[in-house]
Amino acid sequence: MRKLDTRTIVVASHNKGKIAEIADLIGPFGFSAKSAAELNFSEPEETGTTFEENAAIKALASAKASGLPALSDDSGLVIDALDGAPGVYTANWAETADGTRDFAMAMQKVEDALAERGASKPEDRTARFVSVLCLAWPDGHVEYFRGEVEGTVVWPPRGTSGFGYDPIFKPDGYDTTFGEMSADEKHGWKHGDAFALSHRARAFKKFVETCLEA
């Protein structure tokens, strides 16, 4: 595993919600970070079929364009009753005809697909959020960090916090959805803690332990 010997990195994302969450997580570590969106980097086409492949595409593009290490996230909602969908195509389910993303529409698509499968009981609506962070260097070296959190898809959507599919995902052991939690509650982790809640915080915890700590 390669250690990160700089605190200047690029957050390889154009997703405002994702950029904000990563900024919250890296903030305490003294990073100087700009996003690919702020640097006006074009969005690379995500042609991978796994979270790891798509995360690497984004991180490597930003690392090579900037000459700096770049941290990306590829994440998605994996629903058992839908054979793992939307999975790596989670963002695609939200795409509209004009190229924007409508997650209210995407959540309705999820519910409609579950209804078609007759998945109305909680035990038939099990799912997990997956996050794969990729740290890439300009020389092409990459490190991956995967985090997952198990839960249930609920309906109707609950809460207005977070972003994406957060309002319909209730993590196991909790009565509230990610959409009803503050950012601190959703991540459930700060440096030194043994436990993290969200998929992204779990992946980030591995990143810290692997690349930042001595």
Swiss-Prot record:
Top-level taxon in the UniProt lineage: Bacteria
Q: What class of enzyme is it?
A: hydrolase
Cofactor annotation remark: Binds 1 Mg(2+) ion per subunit.
Residues binding substrate, per UniProt: S13, H14, N15, K16, G17, K18, S75, F163, G164, Y165, D166, K186, H199, R200
Active-site residues, record numbering mapped to chain: D74
Q: What are the TM regions of this chain, as residue ranges? A: none
Annotated GO molecular function terms are:
dITP diphosphatase activity; ITP diphosphatase activity; metal ion binding; nucleotide binding; ribonucleoside triphosphate phosphatase activity; XTP diphosphatase activity
Q: What is its EC number?
A: 3.6.1.66
Keywords associated with the record:
Hydrolase, Magnesium, Metal-binding, Nucleotide metabolism, Nucleotide-binding
Stored NCBIfam families: RdgB/HAM1 family non-canonical purine NTP pyrophosphatase
Complex and partners: Homodimer.
Q: What is this protein called?
A: dITP/XTP pyrophosphatase
Organism of origin is: Agrobacterium fabrum (strain C58 / ATCC 33970)
